[in-house]
Amino acid sequence: MAVTVPQAGGIAFRGSGRSLSILLVTSKKQAGFWIFPKGHIEHGETAAEAGVRETEEEAGVTGDLLGPVGAPLEYDWAGKRYSVQYFLIRATAEAPASDGRTIAWLPFEEALARLSFDDTSRLLREARPRMEAPRRA
Protein backbone atom coordinates (compact mmCIF):
# COMPACT_ATOMS: atom_id res chain seq x y z
CA MET A 1 0.00 0.00 0.00
CA ALA A 2 1.28 3.47 -0.87
CA VAL A 3 2.08 6.04 1.77
CA THR A 4 -0.56 8.74 2.18
CA VAL A 5 0.78 12.29 1.79
CA PRO A 6 -0.85 14.67 4.30
CA GLN A 7 -1.86 18.12 3.07
CA ALA A 8 -3.84 21.06 4.42
CA GLY A 9 -5.83 23.86 2.88
CA GLY A 10 -7.95 26.88 3.61
CA ILE A 11 -11.58 27.70 2.87
CA ALA A 12 -11.36 31.48 3.18
CA PHE A 13 -14.38 33.77 3.20
CA ARG A 14 -15.26 37.40 3.81
CA GLY A 15 -18.50 39.23 4.45
CA SER A 16 -21.80 37.66 5.43
CA GLY A 17 -25.34 37.32 4.15
CA ARG A 18 -25.64 38.71 0.63
CA SER A 19 -22.06 40.01 0.75
CA LEU A 20 -20.57 36.59 1.60
CA SER A 21 -17.65 35.83 -0.75
CA ILE A 22 -15.58 32.67 -1.06
CA LEU A 23 -11.93 32.53 -2.13
CA LEU A 24 -10.97 30.19 -4.97
CA VAL A 25 -7.65 29.79 -6.78
CA THR A 26 -6.66 28.11 -10.02
CA SER A 27 -4.90 24.76 -9.87
CA LYS A 28 -1.28 24.68 -11.02
CA LYS A 29 -1.51 20.98 -11.93
CA GLN A 30 -4.83 21.05 -13.80
CA ALA A 31 -5.41 24.02 -16.12
CA GLY A 32 -8.85 25.55 -15.82
CA PHE A 33 -9.65 23.90 -12.47
CA TRP A 34 -10.78 26.04 -9.53
CA ILE A 35 -9.92 24.85 -6.01
CA PHE A 36 -9.30 26.02 -2.46
CA PRO A 37 -5.67 26.84 -1.61
CA LYS A 38 -3.89 23.74 -0.32
CA GLY A 39 -0.53 22.05 -0.14
CA HIS A 40 2.01 20.07 1.84
CA ILE A 41 2.54 20.24 5.58
CA GLU A 42 6.10 21.28 6.40
CA HIS A 43 8.21 19.51 9.04
CA GLY A 44 7.26 20.76 12.51
CA GLU A 45 4.09 22.45 11.26
CA THR A 46 0.55 21.52 12.30
CA ALA A 47 -2.13 20.93 9.68
CA ALA A 48 -3.88 24.13 10.78
CA GLU A 49 -0.67 26.15 10.41
CA ALA A 50 -0.14 24.66 6.95
CA GLY A 51 -3.69 25.54 5.90
CA VAL A 52 -3.18 29.15 6.93
CA ARG A 53 0.27 29.31 5.29
CA GLU A 54 -0.93 27.79 2.00
CA THR A 55 -3.83 30.26 1.85
CA GLU A 56 -1.42 33.15 2.30
CA GLU A 57 1.14 31.81 -0.19
CA GLU A 58 -1.33 30.90 -2.92
CA ALA A 59 -3.80 33.77 -2.55
CA GLY A 60 -2.19 36.44 -0.36
CA VAL A 61 -5.01 36.10 2.17
CA THR A 62 -4.60 36.02 5.95
CA GLY A 63 -7.29 35.77 8.57
CA ASP A 64 -8.78 34.21 11.65
CA LEU A 65 -8.60 30.42 11.84
CA LEU A 66 -12.03 29.04 12.77
CA GLY A 67 -11.12 25.36 12.81
CA PRO A 68 -11.30 22.28 10.60
CA VAL A 69 -14.08 21.65 8.09
CA GLY A 70 -15.25 18.05 7.82
CA ALA A 71 -13.06 14.98 7.61
CA PRO A 72 -9.93 14.96 5.45
CA LEU A 73 -10.56 14.44 1.73
CA GLU A 74 -8.57 11.68 0.06
CA TYR A 75 -7.59 11.51 -3.59
CA ASP A 76 -5.05 9.84 -5.87
CA TRP A 77 -2.82 11.85 -8.19
CA ALA A 78 0.27 10.85 -10.17
CA GLY A 79 0.60 7.52 -8.38
CA LYS A 80 0.28 8.94 -4.87
CA ARG A 81 -2.54 9.09 -2.34
CA TYR A 82 -3.19 12.45 -0.68
CA SER A 83 -5.24 13.32 2.40
CA VAL A 84 -6.24 16.99 2.72
CA GLN A 85 -7.68 18.58 5.85
CA TYR A 86 -9.32 21.92 5.13
CA PHE A 87 -9.68 24.74 7.65
CA LEU A 88 -12.17 27.60 7.72
CA ILE A 89 -10.52 31.04 7.63
CA ARG A 90 -12.30 34.40 8.04
CA ALA A 91 -10.25 36.70 5.80
CA THR A 92 -8.96 39.85 7.48
CA ALA A 93 -6.22 41.04 5.10
CA GLU A 94 -5.01 40.60 1.54
CA ALA A 95 -1.63 41.07 -0.12
CA PRO A 96 -0.20 39.93 -3.45
CA ALA A 97 0.04 36.13 -3.67
CA SER A 98 3.50 34.66 -4.07
CA ASP A 99 2.93 31.83 -6.52
CA GLY A 100 1.24 33.34 -9.56
CA ARG A 101 -2.18 31.71 -9.37
CA THR A 102 -5.36 33.42 -10.48
CA ILE A 103 -7.58 34.14 -7.49
CA ALA A 104 -11.28 34.99 -7.33
CA TRP A 105 -13.65 36.12 -4.60
CA LEU A 106 -17.05 34.76 -5.60
CA PRO A 107 -20.57 34.83 -4.15
CA PHE A 108 -21.35 31.57 -2.36
CA GLU A 109 -23.53 29.98 -5.08
CA GLU A 110 -21.10 30.97 -7.84
CA ALA A 111 -18.20 29.48 -5.86
CA LEU A 112 -20.17 26.24 -5.48
CA ALA A 113 -20.72 26.13 -9.24
CA ARG A 114 -17.11 26.97 -10.11
CA LEU A 115 -15.40 24.49 -7.77
CA SER A 116 -14.02 21.69 -9.90
CA PHE A 117 -14.59 18.80 -7.48
CA ASP A 118 -17.80 17.60 -5.82
CA ASP A 119 -16.08 16.79 -2.51
CA THR A 120 -14.86 20.38 -2.09
CA SER A 121 -18.33 21.68 -3.00
CA ARG A 122 -19.73 19.46 -0.25
CA LEU A 123 -17.23 20.90 2.26
CA LEU A 124 -18.19 24.44 1.27
CA ARG A 125 -21.87 23.66 1.90
CA GLU A 126 -20.93 22.11 5.25
CA ALA A 127 -18.95 25.22 6.26
CA ARG A 128 -21.63 27.79 5.39
CA PRO A 129 -23.45 27.87 8.75
CA ARG A 130 -20.15 28.68 10.47
CA MET A 131 -19.52 31.50 7.99
CA GLU A 132 -22.86 33.05 8.90
CA ALA A 133 -22.36 32.68 12.67
CA PRO A 134 -21.74 35.91 14.58
CA ARG A 135 -18.13 36.71 15.41
CA ARG A 136 -17.04 35.96 18.93
CA ALA A 137 -15.26 38.68 20.88
Put a short name on every predicted segment.
Residues 1-22:
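Conserved N-terminal beta-strand and adjoining loop/helix that marks the start
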Residues 8, 39, 53, 106-109:
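Structural detector for helix-capping/boundary residues
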Residues 12, 26, 86-90:
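Short, well-ordered beta-strand micro-motif
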Residues 13-15, 26-28, 76:
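A generic structural motif
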Residues 18-61:
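Conserved Nudix-box catalytic region and its N-terminal flanking loop in Nudix hydrolases
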Residues 96-100, 115-117:
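Short, charged, solvent-exposed linker or helix-capping segments at domain edges/interfaces
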Residues 113-137:
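Charged phosphate-binding loop/patch that engages nucleotide di/tri-phosphates or the phosphate backbone
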